[in-house]
Amino acid sequence: IKIYGSMILDYAVKMKVIYSNPMKDVLLPKPKDDITSDDKDKYYSKEELKQFLTLVDNENDIKLTAMFRVLAFTGIRKGELQALEWSDIDFTNNTININKTLALNTEKKVVVQTPKSKSSVRNISIDDQTANILKRWKINQRERFLMIGTRVKKHQPCFTDEVTNSYLYLNFMNANLKRICKKNDFKEIKVHGFRHTHCSLLFESGFTIQEVQDRLGHSDLKTTMSIYAHVTEKQRDNMADKFAKFMAL
């Protein structure tokens, strides 16, 4: 609509009907990460997630293991993951501070910018195993740098190209996800699907809507509720069996 409207107004300017095109100043709203009916199946169940993480472990690449582990066990966005610096991770308190993200600028170059919304800036907790995997990767990263001769930066990102120490290209995770799934004939989802997966499993494990919204940094409760509705629909199918087991003598 904006494109066609702008074309008409451009013509009006050319014909000197109006002085300027007001559509030039109209900003399109950012797309929201709602879960639609078309991608309800684009996530992993608890068992599928376990199976996928095992396939990642079989790659014998601690960097990939760390990256997919963090995605699966925190629900952070791909850009937030790839923008992480070691200083953002508090290994004493097992927390990660999300305060930036990677994006493409108008010149198609990878840049660091503030997260997509105010609520996206947040501290999230991580479990001991995730923390230990990250510690292992941190040591391994330094070993790779030392072997190649790469200098460590003052604000060292957690995940970079080991040779150039530059940020990974934005499609890095999707490319490896696709490769691993194809190699093992395994169900393929998109990287953003790990966010839906984490959200769904949080609800299934008993966390409240507010807790999940805060952890995932959803600015719009509608996004959280769309996944919650999907999970409760699944749980409703099991209500009879669960109640029967509860009442069993």
Give a label for each model feature.
Residues 1-3, 14, 18, 23-84, ...:
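Basic, Lys/Arg- and aromatic-enriched nucleic-acid-binding interface segment
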Residues 6-9, 13, 232, 236:
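C-terminal flanking helix
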Residues 14, 69, 73-80, 171-183, ...:
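C-terminal catalytic core of tyrosine-transesterase DNA break-rejoin enzymes
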Residues 35, 102-104, 216-241:
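Catalytic-site neighborhood detector that most strongly recognizes the C-terminal catalytic loop/helix
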Residues 36-41, 57-59, 111-121, 160-169, ...:
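Short, contiguous acidic/charged loop-to-helix segments that flank catalytic cores in large enzymes
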Residues 45-50, 127-186:
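Active-site/catalytic core of tyrosine-dependent DNA strand-transfer enzymes
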Residues 93, 106-121, 125-132, 136, ...:
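C-terminal secondary-structure termini that scaffold catalytic or DNA-interacting sites
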